[in-house]
Swiss-Prot record:
Family matches, as InterPro entries: Cell_div_suppressor_YneA, LysM_dom, LysM_dom_sf
Function: Inhibits cell division during the SOS response. Affects a later stage of the cell division protein assembly, after the assembly of the Z ring, by probably suppressing recruitment of FtsL and/or DivIC to the division machinery.
Pfam families (alphabetical): LysM
Family per record: Belongs to the YneA family.
Name the record gives this protein: Cell division suppressor protein YneA
UniProt keywords, alphabetically: Cell cycle, Cell division, Cytoplasm, DNA damage, DNA repair, Septation, SOS response
CDD domains to which the protein is assigned, alphabetical: LysM (cd00118)
Species, as recorded: Priestia megaterium (strain DSM 319 / IMG 1521)
Source organism, top-level taxon: Bacteria
Length: 109
């Protein structure tokens, strides 16, 4: 009987450790997720580049041009090659909060 309790104790500890690791990994991996519902999207037109978009929206974000480009590449799953071959009609998330653009449009009207 004592051996049974001893092995059950080991199983309980094992599953507790697995549960704790799963919880921690969920928190760590989920921390990098961006709530895209808060961010604006832009539709690419002919000749647009990520650097130009950064400059166009510079009053609406507080990133350097390189940080802006990196954010757009990461969130939209672009690499350097695909970022340079954007096509008209492509839609991209940009690091500009929707409410920032909405407030600016309201002020200008």
């Amino acid at each position: 009987m004592q051996q049974f309790l001893h092995s059950m104790k080991h199983y309980a500890i094992f599953f507790a450790v697995i549960a704790a690791l799963t919880y921690v990994l969920t928190l760590v991996l989920g921390a990098d997720k961006v709530d895209l519902d808060k961010y604006s999207t832009v539709t690419i037109t002919k000749g647009d580049t990520l650097w130009e978009l950064s400059n166009k929206y510079h009053n609406h974000h507080h990133l350097t041009t390189n940080e802006f480009v990196k954010w757009v590449e990461d969130v939209n799953d672009l690499n350097s090659d695909t970022a340079q071959s954007l096509s008209p009609g492509d839609k991209l998330y940009i690091p500009v909060l929707k409410k920032e653009l909405h407030n600016q449009v309201a002020i200008e009207q």
